[in-house]
Design a protein with these regions (language model features):
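Short, mixed-charge aromatic SLiMs
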Residues: 34-36, 68-79, 135-140
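Short, well-structured N-terminal submotif of metal-dependent ribonuclease cores
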Residues: 1-43, 54-67
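Acidic catalytic patch
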Residues: 42, 69, 73-101
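Acidic, PIN/NYN-like endoribonuclease modules and their adjacent C-terminal/linker elements
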Residues: 1-4, 74, 89, 113-150
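Well-ordered alpha-helical segments within folded domains of soluble proteins
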Residues: 48-49
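Short beta-strand scaffold positions
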Residues: 7, 39, 85, 107-110, ...
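Short active-site oxyanion
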Residues: 33-37, 82, 119-124
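Noncatalytic, solvent-exposed loop/strand surfaces
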Residues: 20-23, 27-28, 56, 75-78, ...
Length: 150
């Protein structure tokens, strides 16, 4: 079985932004243990919005945001990042599984979990504590990365 990791928006954004957790996020993305590093169409949509918000708040420039966007596109084209579609079944899974989760998971975060579950990921990468807790409940056979002490 291939060693696959689904990367959510929190980890992807930290890897490409000047954030305190950037070294952790980069270590996850660049780890040689992965056969595939996967993001969903939803991850990419959230990433674009979050990057734009950083521009509007003055945390980064339009030029830097454009460079980051081009880097993501290149990683997708080169196959370093695999793109997973979001399908109707994922939305149905969110409605079906969310009531069984024992933490307050946002719909947007539950969609990441549904895509990772349907796609058979072996690992789930997030820097969001609540998202990781929800992942441990939904994706019981999946390991969360990175190991966080928080």
């Amino acid at each position: 079985m291939p060693n696959t990791v689904y990367v959510d928006t929190s980890l992807l954004l930290a890897a490409f932004s000047n954030e305190p957790n950037q070294p952790i996020a980069l270590a996850v993305l660049q780890s040689p243990q992965w056969d595939q590093v996967c993001v969903s169409d939803w991850t990419l949509a959230e990433f674009a919005c979050a990057l734009h918000a950083k521009v509007l708040r003055g945390e980064t420039s339009k030029g830097v945001a454009h460079t980051i966007d081009q880097t993501i596109k290149r990683l997708l084209e080169d196959g370093a990042l695999q793109r997973l579609p979001v399908i109707r079944e994922d939305y149905n899974a969110v409605r079906r599984v969310t009531p069984e989760i024992r933490c307050l998971v946002r719909g947007a975060d539950a969609l990441h979990l549904a895509v990772a579950d349907r796609s058979g990921m072996t690992h789930f990468a997030s820097l969001d504590k609540t998202q990781r807790l929800a992942a441990q409940q939904w994706l019981q056979e999946v390991s969360c990365v990175p190991e966080l002490n928080k």
